[in-house]
Amino acid sequence: MQNEPMFQVQVDESEDSEWNDILRAKGVIPERAPSPTAKLEEALEEAIAKQHENRLEDKDLSDLEELEDDEDEDFLEAYKIKRLNEIRKLQERSKFGEVFHINKPEYNKEVTLASQGKKYEGAQTNDNGEEDDGGVYVFVHLSLQSKLQSRILSHLFQSAACKFREIKFVEIPANRAIENYPESNCPTLIVYYRGEVIKNMITLLELGGNNSKMEDFEDFMVKVGAVAEGDNRLIMNRDDEESREERKLHYGEKKSIRSGIRGKFNVGIGGNDDGNINDDDDGFFD
């Protein structure tokens, strides 16, 4: 007995039908590709959710007051308390505020040990009763004032010390720190944290050389972790009066964020060459 002939049945795999659903379930035809529209909607939903979650991160207390009519009262009050606690902790750590000029015998205490923070001072507990041994960022300038870049770095240190009072800025003449330290390596910038050297930089080439500005130095501070990228004290985050007024107008016209987002898809409209310290000098910085 001959086998019955096989008939080739043409199936439109893109068709949304009950028969195609059966074939997909049995693996006869592949699953339908996700709709591009559905993918776009999902991506937009995720973007909106992330924006909503982080909407208050860059707001200061005055900004939070302006949002009282738009935000859930309990949520906003809890967030204000969180921000106040952050400000209080920053104030507790803001104990420097100047550039400290030291000599070699003071280096270990004023730099290495100081960078250990509360671990060096003695373990303390935070508001939750947990031990707090947070370190301190210490920036050290091995200086030679006859060099232009060293004078530039001294000026940057002075400005940064006044603004970021929780960071310790220390300056020491390079030849006092290390005998016969090469003048070509000056200025040298060393960053300590929790007793360790986490970054060193020979001359200001990495910042911009003779054209180094405060914005460049602040960017460096962010990169080494000494300052948070969203810190309102940074020049790049500072609002001028015009942009602040625009932001007030923007939030004044917006409906409550927590009441739901309508029309949410209408978006988009309207030293060494390698910058390291010579091995012979490593022992001094431990």
Swiss-Prot record:
Keywords: Cytoplasm, Pheromone response, Phosphoprotein, Signal transduction inhibitor. It is found in: Cytoplasm. Its main location: cytoplasm. InterPro entries: Phosducin-like_chap/apop_reg, Thioredoxin-like_sf. Residues 96-286 are annotated as: Thioredoxin fold. Gene3D superfamilies: Glutaredoxin (3.40.30.10). It comes from the Eukaryota. One of its GO terms (cellular component) is cytoplasm. One of its GO terms (biological process) is positive regulation of transcription by RNA polymerase II. The modification Phosphoserine is found at S35, S62. CDD domains: Phd_like_VIAF. The keyword Cytoplasm applies. Disruption phenotype: Impaired growth, cytoskeletal disruptions caused by actin polarization defects, and abberent nuclear segregation caused by misoriented mitotic spindles. Cells are enlarged or do not bud, caused by cell cycle arrest in G1/S phase. Interacts with the G protein beta-gamma subunit complex (STE4-STE18 complex). Interacts with CCT2; this interaction leads to inhibition of CCT complex mediated actin folding. Belongs to the phosducin family. PANTHER family: VIRAL IAP-ASSOCIATED FACTOR HOMOLOG. Present with 7700 molecules/cell in log phase SD medium. This is Phosducin-like protein 2. It comes from Saccharomyces cerevisiae (strain ATCC 204508 / S288c). The lineage of its organism: Eukaryota, Fungi, Dikarya, Ascomycota, Saccharomycotina. The gene is PLP2.
